[in-house]
UniProtKB/Swiss-Prot annotation:
Listed name of the protein: CASP-like protein ARALYDRAFT_485429
Cross-referenced InterPro entries: CASP_dom, CASPL-5
Extracellular compartment segments: 34-41, 103-128
UniProt-listed Pfam families: CASP_dom
Cytoplasmic compartment segments: 1-12, 63-81, 150-154
Main location: membrane
GO CC entries: plasma membrane
Keyword terms of this UniProt record: Cell membrane, Membrane, Transmembrane, Transmembrane helix
Transmembrane segments: 13-33, 42-62, 82-102, 129-149
Domain of life: Eukaryota
Organism: Arabidopsis lyrata subsp. lyrata (Lyre-leaved rock-cress)
Family note: Belongs to the Casparian strip membrane proteins (CASP) family.
Membrane topology field: Multi-pass membrane protein
Length: 154
Protein backbone atom coordinates (compact mmCIF):
# COMPACT_ATOMS: atom_id res chain seq x y z
CA UNK A 1 0.00 0.00 0.00
CA UNK A 2 1.25 3.41 -0.90
CA UNK A 3 1.79 5.56 2.20
CA UNK A 4 -0.20 8.69 1.37
CA UNK A 5 0.10 11.39 4.06
CA UNK A 6 -3.30 11.88 5.64
CA UNK A 7 -4.64 8.47 4.67
CA UNK A 8 -6.19 6.18 7.24
CA UNK A 9 -3.75 4.91 9.85
CA UNK A 10 -1.15 7.70 9.64
CA UNK A 11 -0.24 10.44 12.08
CA UNK A 12 -1.56 13.10 9.68
CA UNK A 13 -4.88 11.26 9.64
CA UNK A 14 -4.87 11.35 13.45
CA UNK A 15 -4.36 15.13 13.33
CA UNK A 16 -7.29 15.49 10.92
CA UNK A 17 -9.49 13.26 13.11
CA UNK A 18 -8.52 15.16 16.24
CA UNK A 19 -9.50 18.44 14.55
CA UNK A 20 -12.79 16.93 13.38
CA UNK A 21 -13.56 15.78 16.90
CA UNK A 22 -12.78 19.16 18.44
CA UNK A 23 -14.73 21.19 15.85
CA UNK A 24 -17.76 18.89 15.75
CA UNK A 25 -18.01 18.69 19.55
CA UNK A 26 -17.59 22.47 19.87
CA UNK A 27 -20.24 23.07 17.19
CA UNK A 28 -22.61 20.75 19.02
CA UNK A 29 -21.93 22.43 22.36
CA UNK A 30 -22.49 25.93 20.96
CA UNK A 31 -25.71 24.78 19.32
CA UNK A 32 -27.02 23.17 22.52
CA UNK A 33 -26.31 26.16 24.78
CA UNK A 34 -29.83 27.35 24.07
CA UNK A 35 -32.85 25.09 24.48
CA UNK A 36 -34.81 26.97 21.81
CA UNK A 37 -32.79 25.49 18.96
CA UNK A 38 -35.35 22.63 18.83
CA UNK A 39 -37.86 25.11 17.40
CA UNK A 40 -36.03 25.26 14.07
CA UNK A 41 -35.42 22.24 11.85
CA UNK A 42 -32.09 23.45 10.51
CA UNK A 43 -30.62 23.79 13.98
CA UNK A 44 -31.83 20.30 14.93
CA UNK A 45 -30.32 18.95 11.70
CA UNK A 46 -26.89 20.39 12.45
CA UNK A 47 -27.02 19.12 16.04
CA UNK A 48 -27.91 15.64 14.76
CA UNK A 49 -25.15 15.60 12.16
CA UNK A 50 -22.53 16.83 14.63
CA UNK A 51 -23.76 14.21 17.12
CA UNK A 52 -22.99 11.57 14.47
CA UNK A 53 -19.68 13.09 13.34
CA UNK A 54 -18.24 13.33 16.86
CA UNK A 55 -18.24 9.59 17.72
CA UNK A 56 -17.21 8.72 14.15
CA UNK A 57 -14.17 10.97 14.44
CA UNK A 58 -13.32 9.74 17.94
CA UNK A 59 -13.47 6.10 16.84
CA UNK A 60 -11.26 6.71 13.81
CA UNK A 61 -8.84 8.85 15.84
CA UNK A 62 -8.44 5.96 18.27
CA UNK A 63 -7.88 3.59 15.34
CA UNK A 64 -5.30 5.96 13.88
CA UNK A 65 -3.57 6.17 17.26
CA UNK A 66 -3.38 2.39 17.46
CA UNK A 67 -2.06 2.18 13.88
CA UNK A 68 0.63 4.78 14.56
CA UNK A 69 1.75 3.17 17.83
CA UNK A 70 1.84 -0.37 16.41
CA UNK A 71 3.19 0.92 13.07
CA UNK A 72 0.73 -1.23 11.15
CA UNK A 73 -1.34 0.41 8.42
CA UNK A 74 -4.77 -1.08 7.68
CA UNK A 75 -4.46 -2.72 4.28
CA UNK A 76 -7.93 -4.08 3.67
CA UNK A 77 -9.84 -2.64 0.76
CA UNK A 78 -13.18 -3.08 2.52
CA UNK A 79 -12.09 -1.15 5.62
CA UNK A 80 -10.64 1.76 3.66
CA UNK A 81 -13.74 1.85 1.42
CA UNK A 82 -16.03 2.10 4.46
CA UNK A 83 -13.90 4.85 5.98
CA UNK A 84 -13.89 6.75 2.67
CA UNK A 85 -17.65 6.38 2.22
CA UNK A 86 -18.35 7.47 5.80
CA UNK A 87 -16.09 10.49 5.51
CA UNK A 88 -17.57 11.45 2.15
CA UNK A 89 -21.20 11.17 3.27
CA UNK A 90 -20.61 12.90 6.61
CA UNK A 91 -18.68 15.71 4.95
CA UNK A 92 -21.60 16.61 2.72
CA UNK A 93 -24.11 16.21 5.54
CA UNK A 94 -22.08 18.60 7.68
CA UNK A 95 -21.74 21.03 4.76
CA UNK A 96 -25.51 20.99 4.32
CA UNK A 97 -26.08 21.56 8.02
CA UNK A 98 -23.53 24.36 8.23
CA UNK A 99 -25.00 26.14 5.20
CA UNK A 100 -28.54 25.74 6.51
CA UNK A 101 -27.67 27.11 9.95
CA UNK A 102 -25.67 29.99 8.49
CA UNK A 103 -28.54 31.04 6.22
CA UNK A 104 -31.22 30.57 8.90
CA UNK A 105 -29.19 32.57 11.40
CA UNK A 106 -28.76 35.36 8.88
CA UNK A 107 -32.49 35.33 8.21
CA UNK A 108 -33.33 35.42 11.92
CA UNK A 109 -30.79 38.18 12.58
CA UNK A 110 -32.21 40.34 9.80
CA UNK A 111 -35.70 40.22 11.37
CA UNK A 112 -34.92 43.31 13.46
CA UNK A 113 -33.68 41.18 16.37
CA UNK A 114 -37.18 40.16 17.41
CA UNK A 115 -36.59 36.44 17.06
CA UNK A 116 -32.88 36.15 17.57
CA UNK A 117 -31.33 38.41 20.17
CA UNK A 118 -27.61 39.28 20.11
CA UNK A 119 -25.90 36.45 21.97
CA UNK A 120 -28.18 33.76 20.59
CA UNK A 121 -27.41 34.65 16.98
CA UNK A 122 -23.70 34.80 17.76
CA UNK A 123 -23.86 31.29 19.25
CA UNK A 124 -25.55 29.96 16.13
CA UNK A 125 -23.03 31.72 13.88
CA UNK A 126 -20.10 30.28 15.85
CA UNK A 127 -21.68 26.83 15.64
CA UNK A 128 -22.03 27.19 11.86
CA UNK A 129 -18.42 28.38 11.52
CA UNK A 130 -17.17 25.40 13.53
CA UNK A 131 -19.29 23.08 11.39
CA UNK A 132 -17.67 24.56 8.26
CA UNK A 133 -14.22 23.86 9.73
CA UNK A 134 -15.28 20.31 10.57
CA UNK A 135 -16.57 19.88 7.00
CA UNK A 136 -13.24 21.02 5.60
CA UNK A 137 -11.33 18.46 7.68
CA UNK A 138 -13.81 15.69 6.84
CA UNK A 139 -13.50 16.40 3.14
CA UNK A 140 -9.71 16.42 3.40
CA UNK A 141 -9.80 13.02 5.12
CA UNK A 142 -12.13 11.65 2.45
CA UNK A 143 -9.92 12.92 -0.36
CA UNK A 144 -6.73 11.52 1.19
CA UNK A 145 -8.39 8.13 1.65
CA UNK A 146 -9.76 8.23 -1.89
CA UNK A 147 -6.26 8.98 -3.12
CA UNK A 148 -4.82 5.92 -1.37
CA UNK A 149 -7.70 3.60 -2.34
CA UNK A 150 -6.37 2.54 -5.80
CA UNK A 151 -3.08 1.33 -4.31
CA UNK A 152 -4.95 -1.54 -2.64
CA UNK A 153 -6.09 -3.01 -5.96
CA UNK A 154 -2.67 -4.34 -6.93
Amino acid sequence: MENVPGSFGTSASFALRFGQTIFSAASLIFMCFDYDFYDFTTFCYLATVMAIVTPWSILLALTDTYSVLVKLLPQELRVLSIVFAGDFVLSFLSLGGACAVASATELLASADGKICDGNLCIQYQVSAALAFLCWFLLLASALFNFWSLPSLYY
